[in-house]
């Protein structure tokens, strides 16, 4: 290796598009790579949310025109091979122009042509799968990738190149104090149990409509913090209007500081997206997961089982969310010792060093 090659910073091209679940873990890794002196670029789609999320991140974006074909019409499926070929050549052109040394794919359809382009150019590929069930693109790329990272164990068949890393999460989540200390401190201070309901930025209509009637049946004094989405505030507030005196309820359109919300919660009720499950484990919070029933391959149930199978969480399928079932579940969970034990188990199964682990694997390629 020449002196000029030794002095050239490693150039890593990130590939992630479509949803925050793909983009945020990739961004955490990208920022860490930059801090270690790497040059980072990003392969994106022209209209994906990644363009907005990367706007102020000092990461150059290179776009290829690609869309998903899964479940779409016949004409789009027939045109798909030509679109994939065109997108692959576009990605190859960028990679040669930028002299890319390694490629890291985090999902989204952009990663398919990008991974194929890297393979054709002899550039090593790392992929990272956030969910417990591999998405279509990552399932295909796992055959050609040099390193396959999985957030949850056994997502891919056992192999020397498969590494269970966990999902990269934000520093403010990994910095949350231990669950045992937090739960014990609240008990010693005589504080009420805090129930946190999170439906995501848009809210989850099923949670907003079905949880208030069930919670109003509980006789235990509780603080309820219900994040319902901007468009559903009034409707959700109306369902709590006749709440009994033992319930103190705050209905919120969104939560700015999720680290603080996790830290103060005794029980969280939420969907089971990959990053949500990861953050719940990292924070160390007892959880009731309500998997999104329309999630592809029911991957949210698989995500939730990661914590439910070790006693750190309960799973309540949306189809079974009757007032009677919910009341029985919540009555069982209104036990501070049980919630503390669940929270401790959640933290025990967290992988707070996931970001650095993935970065190290990229650096070694």
Swiss-Prot record:
Recorded GO MF terms: UDP-N-acetyl-D-glucosamine:N-acetylmuramoyl-L-alanyl-D-glutamyl-meso-2,6-diaminopimelyl-D-alanyl-D-alanine-diphosphoundecaprenol 4-beta-N-acetylglucosaminlytransferase activity; undecaprenyldiphospho-muramoylpentapeptide beta-N-acetylglucosaminyltransferase activity
Coiled-coil parts of chain: none
Enzyme Commission code: 2.4.1.227
Mode of membrane association: Peripheral membrane protein
CDD domains associated with the record: GT28_MurG (cd03785)
Pathway linked to the protein: Cell wall biogenesis; peptidoglycan biosynthesis
Binding site for UDP-N-acetyl-alpha-D-glucosamine: 19-21, 131, 170, 201, 255, 274-279, 300
NCBIfam families reported for this sequence: murG
Family: Belongs to the glycosyltransferase 28 family. MurG subfamily.
Function: Cell wall formation. Catalyzes the transfer of a GlcNAc subunit on undecaprenyl-pyrophosphoryl-MurNAc-pentapeptide (lipid intermediate I) to form undecaprenyl-pyrophosphoryl-MurNAc-(pentapeptide)GlcNAc (lipid intermediate II).
Protein name in the entry: UDP-N-acetylglucosamine--N-acetylmuramyl-(pentapeptide) pyrophosphoryl-undecaprenol N-acetylglucosamine transferase
Species name: Acinetobacter baumannii (strain ACICU)
